[in-house]
């Protein structure tokens, strides 16, 4: 998985430990239902779009959606992130991170633990997540 602060800037984010139900989502794909392909996309498009807005992304940039517990990710360089949705045990190098605001992090390990309340959360990274587009969407569902 990679993120970019600008179109010319990319970095690989390493998955240290996957969450049980973590996947990349955007706002989904339209126009394929006649072939039996669902729209897909984030389960709460407003939360995904708000997470993106907090870091300066477009509404439809890809985010990481996680359920019940998130992954642990190694950030190779400083990145701006935002967490939306359910409040989870989000920590960076052991320090608790607040939800619903942009956070500038240095290189290190971001751990998205179990949920304190709710079920799903969304992680946006400045520049979006650069995964392949399939039928017009980066969603991996």
Predicted ranges, named:
Residues 1-141:
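Conserved "landmark" site that anchors the functional core of diverse proteins
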């Amino acid at each position: 998985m990679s993120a970019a602060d600008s179109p010319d800037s990319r970095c690989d984010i390493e998955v240290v430990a996957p969450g049980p139900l973590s996947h990349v989502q955007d706002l989904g794909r339209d126009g394929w239902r006649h072939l039996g392909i669902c729209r897909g996309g984030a389960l709460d498009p407003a939360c995904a779009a708000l997470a993106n807005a907090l870091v300066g992304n477009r509404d439809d940039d890809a985010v990481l959606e996680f359920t019940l517990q998130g992954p642990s990710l190694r950030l190779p360089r400083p990145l701006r992130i935002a967490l939306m949705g359910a409040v989870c045990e989000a920590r960076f190098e052991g320090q608790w991170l607040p939800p619903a605001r942009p956070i500038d992090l240095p290189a290190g390990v971001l751990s998205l633990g179990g949920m304190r309340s709710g079920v799903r959360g969304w992680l946006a990274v400045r520049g979006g997540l650069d995964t392949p587009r399939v039928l017009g969407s980066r969603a991996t569902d």
